[in-house]
Design a protein with these regions (language model features):
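A bilobed periplasmic-binding-protein/Venus flytrap-type ligand-binding module shared by bacterial periplasmic
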Residues: 46-48, 81, 119-141, 158, ...
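Alpha-to-beta junction loops
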Residues: 76, 81-91, 106-107, 240-243, ...
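Gly/Pro-rich hinge or "lid" segments in bacterial periplasmic/extracellular proteins
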Residues: 1-59, 64, 74, 191-201
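Extracellular/periplasmic solute-recognition and catalytic clefts
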Residues: 34-44, 68-130, 153-159, 166, ...
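Acidic, glycine-anchored loop motifs typical of Ca2+
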Residues: 208-211
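Ligand-site clamp/hinge motif
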Residues: 18-19, 49-99, 241, 248-252, ...
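Detector for C-terminal structural segments
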Residues: 25, 31, 35, 39-41, ...
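Short, conserved helix/loop micro-motifs enriched in His/Cys and acidic residues
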Residues: 60-64, 174-178, 214-228
């Protein structure tokens, strides 16, 4: 018997713990949550935090942080322009940069434009509850068609002012040297004729002559893109929807809150998943989720929710995934078993990035920089690298 066999007071008395104020919880975190409502959170510096800076000053420096939830992009942007916010990075899209830069002097704030790690992705619900849609979305020819239907250069010019780089999603960002150049640009060429030919092969034909394709069984086919500006900019979504409409796949779009989006994504209710995604090599070396169904978590871009459920439940729930999903899972395990930079690591890194990318499951468009906003009254603000 040892100390691990003795429940701590918090574990021993869960009924008492449930009534504690947030600030009463013991914590090793730099900040403690002292208020949590539907309107936001308030954080207070942990007075017992165990770290100091190189001069011996207690960390963290800032005593309180007041985080407010503003889901409406226009209202959020207005508050930023008016200088009512001290710091903001998440949910600030590059498309808003001109308006923010115009108001910087009068608003008393600065705007950095920094390289991002992630990029906006689109994917189709391969475990959709509608079986006819599931068949279409699961057909790699459909996914390839929808990828080459996108004019990424136009997306870069219009949504990102030419500041981005056209690239495919390869699972690791930035793409390491072991990723072949052909994989980095796989299915990124703009080829609407090729897209139309592939869609014809899938069996999506315009039966009634209205300019939009029906499902192979003759039923109406329409997709909706629910998106939140925390994960992707509205200008890109509008462009993508237009380009898919141009090849006869009827596509609409609607802005929702991040919570609404995540709830729909996790419940397998979306047609199209749209959110940015990107993890550097150092993270992928320790966290395999990008290469294992459902290829992400609740807070970022996922795909194949019912594939993940099937694997997690040993087949008692969900939908059985194709063999390549298992092969990819085994591959990331192999990759992580070797030291980064070794020949074995690079060999398996090339295999898994190639395997994921060639499935065209997660469709990349443009990797663009992201704005970082801070009020000038916030001193000692460093220049971010990413």
């Amino acid at each position: 018997s040892g100390w691990t066999d003795t429940p701590t007071p918090m574990l021993r008395n869960p009924d008492l713990v449930a009534g504690l104020e947030y600030a009463a919880y013991p914590s090793l975190e730099a900040y403690m949550t002292i208020e949590d409502t539907t309107e936001g959170r308030v954080y207070a510096a942990n007075p017992y935090f165990h770290q100091v800076d190189t001069a011996g000053n207690q960390l963290p420096y800032i005593d309180y942080q007041n985080e407010r939830y503003i889901n409406e992009n226009e209202i959020r942007l207005l508050k930023l322009v008016n200088g009512e916010v001290d710091y903001k990075s998440q949910s600030v899209q590059l498309e808003s940069a001109p308006q923010l830069l115009d108001g910087a002097e009068s608003g008393g704030y600065s705007l950095q434009i920094n390289p991002g790690c992630g990029a906006a992705l689109f994917s189709f619900n391969v475990t959709h509850p509608d079986m006819e849609k599931r068949k279409v979305y699961s057909d790699i020819r459909f996914r390839q068609a929808m990828s080459i239907a996108l004019d990424r250069n136009e997306i870069n010019d219009v949504a990102y002012y030419g500041m981005g780089v056209v690239e495919q999603f390869v699972g690791i960002s930035p793409a390491p040297d072991f990723v072949p150049d052909a994989i980095k640009t796989h299915m990124t060429q703009y080829d609407p004729d090729g897209a139309n030919a592939l869609l014809d092969e899938v069996g999506l034909k315009d039966v009634d002559g209205d300019g939009f394709r029906e499902l192979p069984n003759g039923a109406a086919f329409a997709m909706n893109i629910d998106y939140a500006t925390q994960g992707i900019g509205g200008v890109e979504v509008e462009l993508v929807a237009r380009m898919w409409n141009d090849v006869g796949v009827k596509t609409s779009f609607k802005e929702v809150t991040p919570d609404e989006y995540r709830g729909s994504q996790s419940s397998n209710a979306l047609d199209v998943h749209a959110w940015d995604k990107g993890q550097p090599l150092a993270i992928i070396a320790g966290n395999p989720e990008t290469f294992k169904a459902p290829f992400g978590n609740y807070f970022n871009h996922t795909q194949g929710m019912l594939w993940g459920a099937y694997i997690d439940s040993d087949g008692s729930d969900g939908v059985e995934p194709p063999q390549w999903v298992y092969d990819l899972s085994d591959g990331i395990d192999k990759f992580q078993s070797y030291e980064l930079g070794t020949a074995e690591s690079n060999e398996w890194g090339e295999k898994i990035t190639t395997m994921l990318t060639e499935q065209t499951l997660l469709i990349g468009t443009v990797k663009a920089p992201f704005p970082t906003y801070h009020r000038n009254a916030l001193k000692n603000f460093t220049q971010f690298k990413t």
